[in-house]
Amino acid sequence: MLSTLQLTERFEDSREIKNIMGKYVTSCLLCREDTIVDSLFCSRDDISLGFNHGYYVGRQAVKEYYEAVCAATAKKSKCLQKIFPEQLGKLSDEELYGVGPFKAEPLTSFYMQEAEDGETAKAIWMVEGSITDITEKGPVTNWSWGYYCADFVREDGHMKLWHVLRVEDVHCPNGVDWGMPENNFPELPEFSELKDIKLPEPTVKETVYETYSASRGPAKPPRGPEPYKTFAETFSYGV
């Protein structure tokens, strides 16, 4: 049976974990993904970031992914400045950065388990998000419903991110049948320079979670945290 002190410490750990993920999605909302590794992840080299299509494994790979996202954001904002010179033409690069993309990822249904040894924790959230991107087809807003899963490790007395997994159950343009998620909007010449934007390929390419389609059968959510003593006795949200 846990003592009052241990229960208090676990309450503090739970609050810290919620705050970390709140900062994570806020960093994405503010297009500051390039700050995430240094501010929210642990200092270990074996961190990872997973999506439906695979994992970025290792500190360098994760940082390069986030930096590529920010570079793409800067290019999209510059493109909009050319298209709307009256509204955006006088903005500096710093003021302009982040104009266009909008990533709203509200977190809900929080559930976590902390290891009996107190050194690690696991948590899962549902996400009912709406993400606006600037593409070669212009601004496109997609529903992005799914899950955030994460492993945390204690470092210098505080919980830090170790492995993050963000999988989408639904990804489709707003106003489109979920069973027909294809983006069939025409390309627009004024946005053509955005066609060559590509993010780094995952370190490990695999289908981690299949997005909903008319041909997909019923899919279980990602495995939720279960009581465990040490991390060696449980599963990982990373690779």
Predicted regions and their residues:
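Short, low-complexity N-terminal intrinsically disordered segments enriched in polar/charged residues
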Residues: M1-T35, S39-S43
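Extracellular/periplasmic carbohydrate-active domains that bind, remodel
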Residues: G89, M126-E136, P227, F231-G238
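A hydrophobic membrane-anchoring alpha-helix module
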Residues: G179-V239
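A solvent-exposed, acidic/Ser-Thr-rich amphipathic alpha-helical stretch
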Residues: D34-G129
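Short beta-strand edge/turn micro-motifs at domain boundaries
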Residues: T120-I124, W145-E182
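Short beta-strand segments enriched in hydrophobic/aromatic residues
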Residues: C28, F41, V127-G129, L165-E168
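Short, surface-exposed coil-to-beta transition loops
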Residues: E105-L107, N142-C149
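Short, cysteine-centered beta-strand-loop-beta hairpins and adjacent loop/turn segments enriched
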Residues: S130-N142, H171-N174
